[in-house]
Each structure stands twice: as structure tokens, then as C-alpha cells.
Amino acid sequence: MTSTITTTETLQDAVPFVAPPSPPEDTSNKELPEKPYYDVEFNYRLDPRDGGDEVIWGGTVGLMRRKYETRTVRINNERGNEHNFNLDTHGFAWVKHKTSVTEFADYLAIRQGPYFGEVAEMLKRVTGATKVHVIGHLHRSLNYNDTTEEEKNAPDMTMTKGQTPGRFVHVDQSYQGAVRRLYLDLPQEEARRLEKTRWAIINVWRPVRKVTNEPLAVCDARSVREDELFNTLHLVPMRWPDAAPQENQMWAVAPPKTPTQHKWHYVSGMTEDEALLIKMFDSKKDGTARRVPHSSFPTPDDFGEPRASTETRCFVFWEDQEAE
């Protein structure tokens, strides 16, 4: 007697059952745990004699493959303690700042709209400055790990498709780089005049939506020694309009001498109505904080959409104060 195989049995034998994909996790009501600190491995400067690179190629796939010397540091959560920090002592400050702008991805809309003016007025109010000149801004909206994976087969000098959070300890301008930037962005006569009184470069960093992953940490300027700062050439193969010059000098930062030397801080769950002011340079040499190393970092509690943020770089001038 010949057995009969039904159509259903044949299909079941030929095509293994595959469960449908799980729906994405609904994180709309999820909250970050209130942890007082994270112990995180940070990427510090690797000495070129030990295999480190002499040049930082900004905006490239190669930057994401750069070799570093890593150190585990403690990053304290200052949510609720924001008022304890200020620009002149620590080099950074958290402020409340509402904006009328809701869309940050359109470069020209930000440049031509009200946002730069709002930032300038806020900086004058917070710092007492007499003049603020906005250099430009940078919008970040890509996840670091996802971008690293997507670009894994691309050559080092390939420009990334967008901006991810920066995951290495640095200061955007060295002392030399700040002066160079001043003369690049302002008319020579005006730059010479403004250099005679106190001036600074301050970045205004703000989330575009609530931060649930890859937060930004800042290091107390007093805890970083001058001999841990290395003037490093920063090159960009293709200039981003107003975001960075093609050639820049920045500080790469050496690892701390002891695990607790560098004092790192962040504020959890920053929202669109909060901003972090980060000092990159100050002409004052009287003990005023002059530069702040910073870096983003992953946490085991990260969730949600990629972190989206905008960083506005500004010259800040006090024409009624001595330069140093």
C-alpha cells in the first residue's frame, strides 16, 4: 500500500517554522534609573610611541577606529546638584534654557532662524559678557555603535553619514587653536581689538529630545593638569559649513595619574529645556577655569532612540575686563 503525503506535511518538512519578530519595545514611559554614578572605561590619548596617532581625522570612519589608552573613571550624577557648578570655577554649568526652535536637523534653518540669537542672549545673561559671536553649530543624531557597525568595511578616510556622540576625552581647541580660530572667524582688525580684553570659547550643548543613552560627561578643569594636555592637529577632509575649520588644534588628554584624579560629572535624563555650557578656552590666567575635557559614554541602562543633540560654539567677550 502506498502512503500519501499531504501538501501541508510537505511544506512543514521543507520550510522550518520561524517565529514572527517581536514587536519593538515600547519605551515611551520608561525612565532611567536614578543611579548616583557610573564607573566607565574612557578613551584617553595613546602616546604615539605606543601606537597612538599624531593626527585626529574628524568626521571620518577612521576616527571611530582610533587607538586609545583606556582608564576606568567614576562619573558622578549631579541631577539635583546642578547649582553647585559654575563656569569660572569648574569650567562648566547646567542651565535652564527654553527655545522657540523645535527642529534642529535643518542646518540652514538653525543658522538663519532665531536660535543663534537666543543662545547669544542666554550666554550674555549667564556670564555677564558684553559681546557674543556664534561660530556655528553641530547636530548629532546617530548611534555610535550602530554607525561603527554600518561603516565597518569602509576605508578610514570615508566621511561618516552623520554625527555620532564623541567617545574620546578631548577639548575642542587648544590655547593655540583658540587664537587661530579667533582670527579665522573674525575680521583681523576686530580680532586684534577683542584679543586685548578677556575672551573665551564656550559651547552650548543641548538635547533635542530627552537623553536616554550616551550622555555627555564633563571633567572639572581643576582636576586636569597642564602636562596632561597635548596640542593635537585636528583635520577634516571635507569642511562642514561653520562647524569646524579644515585644520584645527585641539587638546588630546592623557590618562590621569591615579584612578580618582580626574573628577567627572554628568546630569541624567537631560531634556530639551536644559543646556550644558562647556568652556573650551578662556584668556584669563588668574586661576579661572580655562578648559574642560569632555566625552560621551555608554551606560548599561541605555535605551530608546539614538541621542540627538545640538552643540553651538560661541566666542564670548568681556570688553570691560583685562585679558589675563
UniProtKB/Swiss-Prot annotation:
Entry's EC annotation: 1.-.-.-
Keywords: Oxidoreductase
Reported phenotype of the disruption mutant: Abolishes the production of cercosporin but accumulates a red, cercosporin-like metabolite called precercosporin.
Transmembrane segment boundaries: none
Pathway assigned in UniProt: Mycotoxin biosynthesis
Biased composition (Polar residues): 1-11
A single GO molecular function term of this UniProt record: oxidoreductase activity
Intrachain disulfide bonds: none
Broad enzyme group: oxidoreductase
InterPro entries: AsaB-like
Region named Disordered: 1-33, 288-308
Domain of life: Eukaryota
NCBIfam families hit by this protein: CmcJ_NvfI_EfuI
Family affiliation: Belongs to the asaB hydroxylase/desaturase family.
Role noted for this protein: Hydroxylase/desaturase; part of the gene cluster that mediates the biosynthesis of cercosporin, a light-activated, non-host-selective toxin. The perylenequinone chromophore of cercosporin absorbs light energy to attain an electronically-activated triplet state and produces active oxygen species such as the hydroxyl radical, superoxide, hydrogen peroxide or singlet oxygen upon reaction with oxygen molecules. These reactive oxygen species cause damage to various cellular components including lipids, proteins and nucleic acids.
PANTHER family in UniProt: BLL6449 PROTEIN (PTHR34598), OXIDOREDUCTASE AN1597 (PTHR34598:SF3)
Protein name as annotated: Hydroxylase/desaturase CTB9
Source organism per UniProt: Cercospora beticola (Sugarbeet leaf spot fungus)
